[in-house]
Regions:
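Basic, short loop/linker segments at the boundary and entry of helix-turn-helix/winged-helix-like folds
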Residues: 1-14, 153
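Short, basic/hydrophobic alpha-helical segments
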Residues: 85-95, 156-174
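Electropositive, glycine- and tryptophan-enriched low-complexity nucleic-acid-binding patches
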Residues: 121-169
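Active-site-proximal, Lys/Arg-enriched surface segment
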Residues: 45, 56-132
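Short, basic interhelical loop/turn and adjoining N-cap
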Residues: 4-5, 35-54
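Catalytic or ion-translocation cores adjacent to nucleophile or general acid/base/metal-coordination motifs
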Residues: 144, 153, 192-210
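Short, conserved catalytic/metal-binding motifs centered on acidic residues
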Residues: 15-16, 30, 47-52, 102-110, ...
Length: 210
């Protein structure tokens, strides 16, 4: 955030976490119930619920709609601002260090939800299927997708954005690991360009046994 803003993201995130760590159930509790107590802390600058919600809105990203070769339409959300803040926060807290190399894992997770835009997944429930990148036990990138999206559809672009964001922050991937949902020529070629070694499980097919 611009330094001329009243609160930085670090202060806003601390205020948001205080809601849940102090027994609150919604963001508004920070103003109505917790502010008078949190204000006694000598170094914690606690912001109002309105400020927290405005900051969250600043980080939102409009969906991008893609059309497949077969004519089907899928919504993606790249969450660029949120992902950039995520990487910066991991660097600021020392969970990632610039100049070091890490092992990188990527997979799609299926999240069940009853939201209005949820789509049927192959797991037989409505939801989303975000692509999630992890280093160790911390998430370093996440992009949401419709639940009915084929796992390989535009996966190359998703991975490339995540790799480039990490590289721009000085974080490099030594080894990348993915399951057979990433086993395609274009995805393998892109992954190879951004890491020293990669492990991608091959699809089961008759040619493997020939």
């Amino acid at each position: 955030r611009c330094k001329w803003y009243g609160y930085q993201y670090s202060e806003i995130l601390r205020s948001l976490m205080c809601v849940y760590l102090c027994g609150g159930s919604c963001v508004e509790d920070v103003t109505t119930h917790l502010m008078r107590h949190l204000s006694l802390h000598p170094s914690l600058r606690t912001c109002s619920a309105d400020t927290i919600l405005r900051a969250i809105e600043e980080l939102t990203c409009q969906n991008t709609t893609y059309q497949s070769a077969s004519g089907r339409v899928y919504d993606f959300n790249t969450a660029d601002k949120m992902n950039s803040l995520l990487v910066n926060a991991l660097l600021a807290t020392g969970q990632l260090k610039a100049g070091q190399e890490y092992d990188f894992d990527f997979d799609h997770q299926f999240i069940e939800t009853e939201k209005y835009d949820a789509k049927p997944t192959y797991k037989k429930f409505l939801g989303y299927s975000p692509g999630v990148a992890v280093i160790g036990d911390v998430i370093v990138g996440i992009e949401n997708r419709d639940g009915n999206t084929n796992v390989r559809f535009n996966q190359k672009e998703t991975l490339e954005r995540i790799f480039k964001r990490l590289e721009a922050s000085g974080v490099h991937v030594a080894r990348a690991r993915m399951d057979c949902g990433s086993c395609s020529e274009e995805i393998v070629g892109m992954v190879e360009a951004h890491c020293k070694h990669f492990y991608i499980r091959a699809n089961r097919c008759s040619s493997l046994y020939d």
